[in-house]
């Protein structure tokens, strides 16, 4: 009797344990079908003595490490000043973050910003960081500018833990002088992209006004066909002419057909983003046009393609403050500057031809953002909020507002 009782208890416990495992797996599946939006601060103002963190960028390595980076504005909130580039790494999909790394600039210090109208004799401005994950080599190429006048690249081959010495690549911008005598150069901001042929492409903007001005400006790309060993200039994608006023701060992504879609900020009258496409990412750009669904509050935006290998079909995602300026009657003010708030995300199933389901990530103060995705399809958005840079984690169910995607 004792043996039989023990045996029955053992069988009961085993069956109960298996039932718990089954229910746990079932609840996990149910949870995967539910919408997800959660947030964590990554770069709050005041951390490490930094007055303000701005200009976020984000990539996910081939091994799934999340790299978040931005400008660390040491002494002021201004674009010009003592600025470094800081980075944090996440090994759990953006839920927790390792300590801050100061990754640029670690070459010869270059003070006395020649592009600043007044002051700055002892300042070094490191600006506009852009990372690209080379999915053929696993390395991370990282570009940034110095004093809005010179451009450098560094590389990591260990998931962003250590970085190479900087190499200057300013010569890549010289061909643009044939059309515009630029005085200011800037990469991105945000992230670059890699085409199916291995080419690395980074959006850039250049300005040719008076010292201290970021306008008039125009947009193009630089590229590397040898895994970041050498960089060259592409053709101008969005010139400063006609109805396109001072285009700058572009973001690009690949399309389902292997081409490149470029989305550009400007101060043009329609208050809409400028879009153009290219099959190569460097030339043959289509005639720029304003996209009626992409509002322009005069703020950098992010765009990202999630390939059909992750979901059943390709998605393009787009984030920016969904705002335009309006008068007291609610009528749009041409060439107005919308308030930087209401950071929203929308998606496209047709390579950016049309956009659906505008969802609000941050209703309050919010501005620049950058998008990435994890191998399991979780979408990450690193964005500027009120005195902080935050990482939002979300799934496609939340973005589309539909379950079972």
Residue ranges and their predicted role:
Residues 14-26:
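Bacterial N-terminal signal peptides
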């Amino acid at each position: 009797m004792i043996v039989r009782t023990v045996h029955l208890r053992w069988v009961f416990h085993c069956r109960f344990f298996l039932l718990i495992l089954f229910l746990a797996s079932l609840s996990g599946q149910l949870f995967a079908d539910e919408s997800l939006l959660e947030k964590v601060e990554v770069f709050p103002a005041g951390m490490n003595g930094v007055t303000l963190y701005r200009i976020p960028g984000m990539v996910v390595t081939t091994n799934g490490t999340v790299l978040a980076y931005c400008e660390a504005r040491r002494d002021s909130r201004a674009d010009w000043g003592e600025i470094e580039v800081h980075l944090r790494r996440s090994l759990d999909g953006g839920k927790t973050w390792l300590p801050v790394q100061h990754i640029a600039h670690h070459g010869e210090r270059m003070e006395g910003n020649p592009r600043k109208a007044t002051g700055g004799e002892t300042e070094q401005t490191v600006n506009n960081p852009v990372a690209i994950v080379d999915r053929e080599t696993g390395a991370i190429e990282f570009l940034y500018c110095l004093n809005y006048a010179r451009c450098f690249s560094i590389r990591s081959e260990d998931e962003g833990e250590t970085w190479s010495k900087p190499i200057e690549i300013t010569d890549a911008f010289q061909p643009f002088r044939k059309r515009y005598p630029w005085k200011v150069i800037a990469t991105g901001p945000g992230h670059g992209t890699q085409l199916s042929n291995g080419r690395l492409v980074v959006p850039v903007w250049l300005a040719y006004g008076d010292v201290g001005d970021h306008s008039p400006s125009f947009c193009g790309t630089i590229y590397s066909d040898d895994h970041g060993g050498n960089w060259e200039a592409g053709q101008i994608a969005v010139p400063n002419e006609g109805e396109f006023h001072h285009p700058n701060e572009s973001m690009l992504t690949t399309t389902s057909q292997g081409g490149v879609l470029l989305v550009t900020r400007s101060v043009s009258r329609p208050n809409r983003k400028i879009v153009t496409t290219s099959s190569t990412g460097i030339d043959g750009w289509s005639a720029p046009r304003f996209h009626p669904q992409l509002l322009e509050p005069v703020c950098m935006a992010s765009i990202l393609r999630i390939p059909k290998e992750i979901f059943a079909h390709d998605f393009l995602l787009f984030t920016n403050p969904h705002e335009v300026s309006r008068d007291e009657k609610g009528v749009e003010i041409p060439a107005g500057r919308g308030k930087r708030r209401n950071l929203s995300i929308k998606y496209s199933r047709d390579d950016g031809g049309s956009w659906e389901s505008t969802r609000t990530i941050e209703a309050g103060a919010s501005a620049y953002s950058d998008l990435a995705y994890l191998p399991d399809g979780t979408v990450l958005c690193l964005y500027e909020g009120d005195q902080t840079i935050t990482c939002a984690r979300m799934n496609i169910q939340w973005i589309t507002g539909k379950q079972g995607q």
